């Protein structure tokens, strides 16, 4: 095998009318939008700034005079790929997305409206999916600290669907755009991976009337002795500790306070914010020990994974507690005897009225009982290796777990390979064949089959208990019903269909995800409240939690890998140039501190529809429409949910054509839309073809699991889940798959020098369409859950040799597998592809481990025994379903979808 880089054949493209291929790439790989002549002629007509007016001092030209995504997003070439991967370090840091204007008169120049004809932008410019939202442009003096670059929250934490807020409800209604906030309070699984500033004392200054927290947008009065609330306008006293430290006797500068400088901040809470002292972190593991779980290897894999993860459980204060319950048709408790290494197994067979068989020793301190816990986890599988018990009494086990930890709170972590089939909460297999593909499918198969699970979940929430599910059965498990447990307790459902320990890749995925799940620095006993300026009301809440009151969301434990959406309504006319939003999470940390994480957002207002459209965030809009489509599917039907998504696109296009197309020219294309929204139609179209909504027959467990993911994924993962990312590996540049080279200035010499970073360069994505493919290519598909490596049927033999170590295409392993590992010297191409896969799998804000599926495409030379392999055919169809721009099954292509839209909008 040669390590020499091969020159693989390059695909040749024909640049048709309106092709994006002729557009020069922007540094860093983001493609410059391609505008037609007709649009360029309309640019000044669409401006909301007088073209004769001089540029406003302090206003970046990208926001006032260039197309969305052009000058604003040109990043330095060396580090551009990382430019939009900002994490917590940028949470309160400098941002080019939030701008303050200087010397503003009456008219505030906001983002400019540019029009795109969707029918002329095929294939759609997918580089837009990597861009941040349109900038938020604030008037001068909005922030207490002049020209602060850290006052507004980064979109990774807190973003709005509209970065200009309508001044009245009629304008919002007229726009057909949703008004909602997307909140993701945490952006890494571990505390140390974030850089959110924390107050140095327990002084918390809040408005006496609206209870808003002091923030970078307040104003000072009476020589700095009082602050005026930016939410309700009330004057409040500045705490004396802001200016004088009584302990050290030193004078302080109040303008140095982190809460006055940063959009995202954590307050250390005093005792009055505690209903009780912060509780220890608690994990009660409910483990399926029935014959299904034992034979599939779940029981052994989980106990080994927990054993290997004990050091990763957050336990800085040495107070973490654990308990274990084995479940078949009986409940098997494990009592730890103080001072002894061993444990007792206590079996309760009365599942109708389950009870705790011992008053102590069931829930124990992990640190103090470490040896006994380790021994139990080593011996655990042997207790059940000869079982023939087919029962699984999940309901009674949950009630026992609740009884065990209800005085403290914590987590019930359930591992199941069996449908609950005995005791309270018993479920049965539903008749899918009779309703699949019919309007009543959702209500019959996706609704809860037993009210126990929701009512129990609500009880858990009030007891500060979260429930997490890891479901691994190869047969029906009723994910739709069971997912009520995590949905109302701020947990999550994890679904592993046909899982078996005989497959190393299955074991790797489950083990990594469980281990990362246990290692999260979760917050405990948390509540989320979002407040807005006068005239704005929080009307609907979406995500995994329970609404304790009209505006208070309750989280027994607060996960770090989910996001939440709050829909808003405008109750009163807004007569101020800026409105404010504040999200606050009161919680206990895993290391025993009571804290409040506060996120602040200021957004300008306008009475002009073009301002609203020019600043709309297409990714946040996709997020809220996804939640509302799920709501429609569960309350009505899947066809209604798909119609909802299509109708939203039609409504928005109709408004744009009627109200915003320059001069409303007769005969103008009905598919014109603002450039910053040009990917919204394909995202909503792709959503109709998603596993959760598509019209084709889908097993109800798979559909329910997909809807669970759609309802909790943060925006970057949600977008990829809807519109998968595809990379062409056979044509990638030489630097892809290798560490990125950066140029930096040596502080001592002042000279530029090249530095090798740890960041792996990824290829530029291509469109989700076979028209972007070559029949001799190699493609990597990332759909946020799995990775597909597509090896085309006419692939170059040398490429197969370099990647797999054989030139026989049909000798390579297909299906769920891993690539052979060759060193850089043995095969540079293999090394680079594995580096790319490793980079895609690498994340610090999600526990998901993406399995790799190798798929060999068909060809005219394919042996008949290969073409008759049902598993391979199914695998090809699965991978093809990721190409959402193409016609798949009964679903139309994106081009056909646009044609249908044109008819509907023209009516």
UniProtKB/Swiss-Prot annotation:
Which terms in the GO cellular component ontology are assigned?
cis-Golgi network; COPII vesicle coat; endoplasmic reticulum exit site; endoplasmic reticulum membrane; equatorial cell cortex; Golgi membrane
Alphabetized GO MF terms:
SNARE binding; zinc ion binding
Q: Where in the cell is it found?
A: Cytoplasm; Cytoplasmic vesicle, COPII-coated vesicle membrane; Endoplasmic reticulum membrane; Golgi apparatus membrane
Q: Where is this region: Disordered?
A: 1-34
Among the Pfam families in the record, one is Sec23_trunk
The Polar residues compositionally biased stretches are: 11-22
Main localisation? cytoplasm
Swiss-Prot/TrEMBL keywords: Cytoplasm, Cytoplasmic vesicle, Endoplasmic reticulum, ER-Golgi transport, Golgi apparatus, Membrane, Metal-binding, Protein transport, Transport, Zinc
Residues reported in the UniProt entry to bind Zn(2+):
207, 210, 229, 232
Q: How does it sit in the membrane?
A: Peripheral membrane protein
Q: Write out the GO biological process terms.
A: COPII-coated vesicle cargo loading; intracellular protein transport
Top-rank taxon, per record? Eukaryota
* Annotated region (Zinc finger-like), positions in chain: 207-232
> What PANTHER family does UniProt report for this protein, alphabetically?
SEC24-RELATED PROTEIN, SECRETORY 24AB, ISOFORM A
Briefly, what is this protein's role? Component of the coat protein complex II (COPII) which promotes the formation of transport vesicles from the endoplasmic reticulum (ER). The coat has two main functions, the physical deformation of the endoplasmic reticulum membrane into vesicles and the selection of cargo molecules.
- UniProt record similarity statement: Belongs to the SEC23/SEC24 family. SEC24 subfamily.
The record's subunit annotation is: The COPII coat is composed of at least 5 proteins: the SEC23/24 complex, the SEC13/31 complex, and the protein SAR1. Golgi apparatus membrane; Peripheral membrane protein; Cytoplasmic side.
Name assigned to this protein: Protein transport protein SEC24
């Amino acid at each position: 095998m040669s390590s020499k880089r091969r020159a693989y054949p390059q695909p040749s493209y024909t640049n048709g009318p309106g092709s994006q291929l002729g557009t020069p790439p922007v540094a860093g790989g983001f493609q410059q939008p391609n505008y037609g002549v007709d649009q360029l002629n309309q640019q000044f007509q669409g401006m909301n700034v007088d073209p004769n007016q001089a540029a406003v001092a302090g206003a970046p030209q990208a926001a006032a005079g260039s197309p969305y995504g052009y000058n604003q997003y040109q990043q330095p070439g060396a580090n551009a790929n990382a430019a939009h991967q900002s994490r917590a370090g940028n949470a309160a840091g400098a941002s080019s997305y939030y701008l303050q204007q200087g010397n503003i008169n009456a008219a505030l120049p906001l983002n400019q409206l540019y029009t795109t004809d969707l029918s002329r932008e095929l294939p759609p410019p997918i580089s837009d999916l990597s861009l941040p939202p349109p900038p938020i442009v604030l008037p001068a003096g909005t922030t207490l600290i002049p020209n602060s670059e850290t006052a507004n929250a980064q979109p990774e934490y807190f973003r709005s669907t509209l970065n200009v807020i309508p001044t009245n409800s009629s304008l919002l209604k007229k726009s057909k755009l949703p008004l909602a906030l997307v909140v993701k309070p945490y952006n890494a699984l571990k505390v140390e991976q974030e850089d959110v500033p924390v107050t140095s004392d327990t002084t918390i200054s809040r408005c006496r009337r609206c209870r808003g927290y002091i923030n970078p947008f307040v104003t000072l009065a009476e020589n700095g002795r009082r602050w005026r609330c930016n939410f309700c306008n009330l004057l409040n006293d500045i705490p004396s500790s802001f200016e004088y430290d009584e302990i050290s006797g030193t004078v302080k500068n109040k303008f140095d306070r982190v809460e006055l400088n940063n959009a995202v901040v954590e307050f250390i809470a005093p005792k009055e914010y505690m209903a009780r002292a912060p509780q220890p972190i608690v994990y009660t593991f409910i483990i399926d020990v029935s014959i299904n779980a034992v034979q599939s290897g779940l029981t052994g894999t989980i106990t080994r994974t927990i054993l290997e993860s004990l050091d990763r459980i957050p336990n800085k204060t040495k107070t973490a507690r654990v308990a274990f319950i084995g479940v078949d048709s009986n409940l098997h408790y494990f009592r730890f005897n103080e001072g002894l290494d061993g444990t007792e197994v206590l079996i309760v067979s009365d599942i109708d009225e389950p009870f705790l068989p011992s008053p102590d020793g069931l829930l124990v301190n992990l640190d103090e009982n470490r040896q006994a816990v380790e021994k139990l986890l080593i011996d655990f599988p042997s207790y059940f290796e000869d079982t023939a018990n087919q029962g699984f009494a999940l309901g009674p086990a949950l009630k026992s777990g609740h009884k065990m930890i209800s005085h403290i709170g914590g987590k019930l972590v359930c591992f199941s390979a069996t449908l609950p089939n005995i005791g309270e909460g018993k479920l049965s297999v539903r008749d899918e064949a009779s309703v699949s593909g019919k309007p009543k499918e959702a209500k019959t198969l996706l609704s809860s089959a037993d009210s126990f699970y929701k009512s129990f979940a609500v009880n858990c929430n009030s007891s500060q208990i979260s429930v997490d599910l890891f479901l691994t059965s190869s047969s029906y498990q009723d994910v739709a019903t069971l997912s009520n447990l995590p949905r109302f307790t701020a947990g999550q459902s994890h679904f592993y269909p046909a899982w078996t320990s005989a497959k190393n890749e299955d074991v790797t995925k489950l083990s990594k995800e469980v281990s990362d799940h246990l290692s999260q620095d979760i917050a405990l006993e948390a509540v989320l409240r979002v407040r807005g300026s006068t005239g704005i009301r929080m009307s609907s809440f979406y995500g995994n939690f329970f609404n304790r009151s009209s505006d208070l969301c309750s989280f027994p434990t607060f996960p770090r890998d989910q996001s939440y959406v709050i829909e808003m309504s405008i109750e009163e006319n807004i007569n101020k140039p800026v409105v404010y939003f504040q999200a606050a999470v009161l919680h206990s940390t895993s290391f025993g501190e009571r804290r409040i994480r506060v996120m602040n957002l200021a957004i300008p207002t306008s009475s002009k529809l073009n301002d609203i459209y020019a600043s709309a965030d297409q990714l946040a809009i996709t997020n809220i429409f996804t939640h509302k489509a799920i709501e429609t599917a569960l309350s009505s039907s899947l066809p209604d949910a798909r119609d909802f998504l299509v109708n939203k696109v039609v409504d928005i296009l109709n408004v744009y054509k009627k109200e915003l197309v320059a001069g409303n020219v007769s005969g103008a294309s009905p598919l014109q839309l603002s450039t910053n929204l040009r990917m919204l139609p394909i995202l909503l179209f792709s959503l109709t073809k998603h596993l959760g909504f598509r019209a084709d027959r889908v097993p109800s467990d798979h559909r329910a699991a997909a809807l669970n993911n759609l309802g909790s994924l943060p925006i970057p993962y949600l977008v990829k889940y809807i519109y998968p990312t595809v990379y062409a590996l056979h044509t990638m540049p030489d630097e892809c798959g290798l560490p990125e080279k950066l140029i930096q200035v040596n502080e001592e010499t002042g000279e530029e020098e090249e530095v090798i970073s740890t960041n792996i360069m990824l290829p530029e994505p291509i469109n989700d369409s076979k028209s972007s493919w070559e029949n001799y290519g190699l493609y990597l598909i990332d759909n946020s859950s799995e990775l597909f490596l597509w090896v085309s049927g006419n692939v170059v033999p040398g490429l197969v040799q370099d990647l797999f170590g054989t030139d026989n295409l049909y000798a390579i392993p297909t299906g769920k597998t891993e690539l052979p590992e060759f060193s850089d010297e043995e095969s540079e191409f293999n090394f680079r592809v594995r580096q790319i896969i490793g980079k895609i799998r690498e994340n610090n804000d999600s526990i998901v481990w993406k399995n790799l599926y190798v798929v060999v495409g068909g060809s005219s030379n394919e042996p008949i025994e290969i073409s008759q392999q049902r598993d391979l055919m199914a695998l090809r169809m699965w991978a093809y379903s990721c190409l959402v721009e193409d016609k798949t099954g009964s679903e139309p292509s994106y081009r056909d979808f646009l044609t249908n839209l044109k008819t509907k909008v023209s009516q």
